[in-house]
């Protein structure tokens, strides 16, 4: 994934030093796009190890509509715990907006599947996780926001759109805020996996995954890790094999996915900015 290393280098070379909500500080650019041909391998970063269970379980959790971390914790995925209440609640985050937008029964995922099957040339085949009604206040804690009925965090990956050409399904993600070192490799893998799943459900081949970022930043406490990653040579991409076709997009299980020949450099640890 040379494209991803080019992205990191571009931020380092062209970014502006900025403060941020977390107080950590960043080097930031505005606007960047990467394209991945899903026919040429699954875009899983190889210059460090990506924790595949976190990618898969989080996506299945989103698709379930859940906003409580219990399922994640039961599967040893703790990436959301910092923002959850003592009861594990995160408020109306991704899963709620995808499956029951604004609490009004609008299942955006089901609607996308139906449109892809019945109106594949539509330019309205998209899902929005951004709901201004529940965007949290930056003046209070995530847990206090949840108590007020808001999300613990606003969605970083805010909207994604689908497009069919030559019987191939492509997906474009718009990410308003992009943690280049920790978050973006994860997001690329997650939405590429979702594209494969929806393509299977709609009897389509996969096309491209296009990642579009708004505020793309490297946190100041990730610079050393980014330099280490840039020193590494990318390896061949793995391939994804889906072992069965469930009856719906909501019925996949972790065991349905096999990432074949995932060769990678060692993991690089870094602190998340809360």
Curated annotation (Swiss-Prot):
One of its GO terms (molecular function) is thymidylate synthase activity. The keyword Transferase applies. One of its GO terms (cellular component) is cytosol. The active site is at 156 (nucleophile). Catalyzes the reductive methylation of 2'-deoxyuridine-5'-monophosphate (dUMP) to 2'-deoxythymidine-5'-monophosphate (dTMP) while utilizing 5,10-methylenetetrahydrofolate (mTHF) as the methyl donor and reductant in the reaction, yielding dihydrofolate (DHF) as a by-product. This enzymatic reaction provides an intracellular de novo source of dTMP, an essential precursor for DNA biosynthesis. Disulfide bonds: none annotated. It is found in: Cytoplasm. Pathway: Pyrimidine metabolism; dTTP biosynthesis. It catalyses: dUMP + (6R)-5,10-methylene-5,6,7,8-tetrahydrofolate = 7,8-dihydrofolate + dTMP. Its main location: cytoplasm. Belongs to the thymidylate synthase family. Bacterial-type ThyA subfamily. This is Thymidylate synthase. Keywords: Cytoplasm, Methyltransferase, Nucleotide biosynthesis, Transferase. Homodimer. Coiled coil: none annotated. DUMP binds at residues 21, 123-124, 176-179, 187, 217-219. GO terms for biological process: dTMP biosynthetic process; dTTP biosynthetic process; methylation. The lineage of its organism: Bacteria, Pseudomonadati, Pseudomonadota, Gammaproteobacteria, Thiotrichales. Gene3D superfamilies: Thymidylate synthase/dCMP hydroxymethylase domain. (6R)-5,10-methylene-5,6,7,8-tetrahydrofolate binds at residues 51, 179, 273. Its EC number is 2.1.1.45. It comes from Francisella philomiragia subsp. philomiragia (strain ATCC 25017 / CCUG 19701 / FSC 153 / O#319-036). The keyword Cytoplasm applies. HAMAP family: Thymidy_synth_bact (MF_00008).
């Amino acid at each position: 994934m040379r494209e991803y290393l080019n992205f990191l280098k571009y931020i380092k070379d062209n970014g502006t030093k900025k403060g941020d909500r977390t107080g950590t500080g960043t080097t930031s650019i505005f606007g960047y796009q990467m394209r991945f041909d899903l026919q040429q391998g699954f875009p899983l970063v190889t210059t460090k190890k990506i924790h595949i269970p976190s990618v898969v379980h989080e996506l299945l959790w989103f698709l379930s509509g859940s906003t409580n971390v219990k399922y994640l914790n039961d599967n040893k995925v703790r990436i959301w715990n910092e923002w959850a209440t003592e009861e594990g609640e995160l408020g109306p985050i991704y899963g709620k907006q995808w499956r029951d937008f604004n609490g009004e029964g609008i299942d955006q995922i089901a609607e996308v599947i139906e449109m892809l099957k019945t109106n594949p040339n539509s330019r309205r085949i998209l899902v929005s996780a951004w709901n201004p009604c529940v965007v949290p206040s930056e003046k209070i804690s995530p847990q206090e926001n949840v108590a007020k009925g808001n999300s613990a965090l606003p969605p970083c990956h805010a909207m994604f759109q689908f497009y069919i050409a030559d019987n191939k399904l492509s997906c474009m993600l718009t990410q308003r805020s992009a943690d280049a070192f920790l978050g973006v490799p994860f997001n690329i893998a997650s939405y590429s996996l979702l594209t494969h799943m929806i393509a299977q459900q709609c009897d389509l081949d996969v096309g491209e995954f296009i990642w579009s970022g708004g505020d793309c930043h490297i946190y100041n406490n990730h610079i050393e890790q980014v330099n280490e990653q840039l020193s590494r040579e990318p390896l061949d991409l793995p391939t994804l094999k889906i072992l069965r076709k469930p009856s719906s997009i909501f019925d996949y299980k972790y065991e349905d996915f096999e990432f074949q020949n995932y060769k990678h450099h060692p993991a690089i640890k870094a602190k998340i900015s809360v």
